[in-house]
Amino acid sequence: MSLDDLQAATKIQKRYLTALEEGNYDIIPGKFYVRAFIKQYAEAVGLDADQLFEEHKKDIPNTYHDDVSEKISGMNLQKEMPKPASKALELLPTILVILGVIVVIAIVYAIIQFANHKNSDDHNAASEKAITQSESKYEIPKDSTLKENQNNSSEKETDTKKETKENEDKKKENDSEKLEIKAAGTEGSLTTYEVSGADKIELELKASDSSWIRVRDENSSSLKEGTLKKDETYKKDITDQKQVDIRTGYAPNLKIKINGKVLSYELDPKKVMAQTIKIVNKKEEKSS
């Protein structure tokens, strides 16, 4: 992967990328950024950042600063002298009386609430019993026409839901069968694909291992940007998009599907690891 590809994938300036590769950490502004840049670099090329930190911990600066002396100097170590407690002792009897009154009030309130709640429960139980007895007088016979109609309605609703699901599954299969994916050409690390033939187009990105991605719509607005973890999947309906650009920092770890069909890389991912995939929707406009 070239420095230009790494810069595009990680957003780190090339001079800092060169410094990372050469182990020249002094030109990077701050120890925190050294570790942050190394982590981004590792993710872009498919390496384990934690393993890198462990193997090169003697060379990579630590973000922890042992500045205990400065922190101690800024602390106020003066101890306050205990204040006279005589005034508090004078108020103690009054405080105890107030607390006692509060406790008594709380107990009385709890007793009243319990009594009201019990009366309410008894009243509700009596009402429910009366309603149950009333309903039992008008219970619908098991063989009545009304119950038969209810059963028929329930069966029809179940059949309708089943038929709707079957139609949806059939439509997805038809879209997948009618879909055509055509490689229109490559330029540098960019490959353009044209898709047509399907009424609905769904994009699916799945990472076999950590892989950074960026997805933009026809207006260059970001739809997704970040690192997909191992076995993580991103899906997006792009039926209404004229085109979608997909940038991957490490193509060997990323599988691209359209309507379930795997898109084959025109550029060998092992040779061109950072790639841009442009999906152009060639769906024909329906005449009015």
Swiss-Prot record:
**Membrane topology category:** Single-pass membrane protein
Q: Which Gene3D superfamilies match?
A: lambda repressor-like DNA-binding domains
- Residue ranges, annotated region (Disordered): 121-183
Q: What is its main location?
A: membrane
Q: Give TM regions.
A: 92-112
Q: Sorted alphabetically, which InterPro entries does this protein's record hold? A: Bact_Cytoskel_RodZ, Lambda_DNA-bd_dom_sf, RodZ-like_C
- Stretches with biased composition (Basic and acidic residues): 136-146, 154-181
Q: Which residues does UniProt call coiled coil?
A: 147-185
Q: Which GO terms describe its cellular component?
A: plasma membrane
Q: Where is this protein localized, as stated in its record?
A: Cell membrane
Return any one Pfam family short name.
Answer: RodZ_C
- Alphabetic keyword roster: Cell membrane, Coiled coil, Membrane, Transmembrane, Transmembrane helix
**Which GO terms label this protein's molecular function in UniProt?**
DNA binding
Q: Which PANTHER family match?
A: CYTOSKELETON PROTEIN RODZ, PTHR34475
Its name, as the record gives it, is Uncharacterized membrane protein YmfM
**Organism (species):** Bacillus subtilis (strain 168)
Task: Give the organism's phylogenetic lineage.
Answer: Bacteria, Bacillati, Bacillota, Bacilli, Bacillales
Supply the gene name. Answer: ymfM
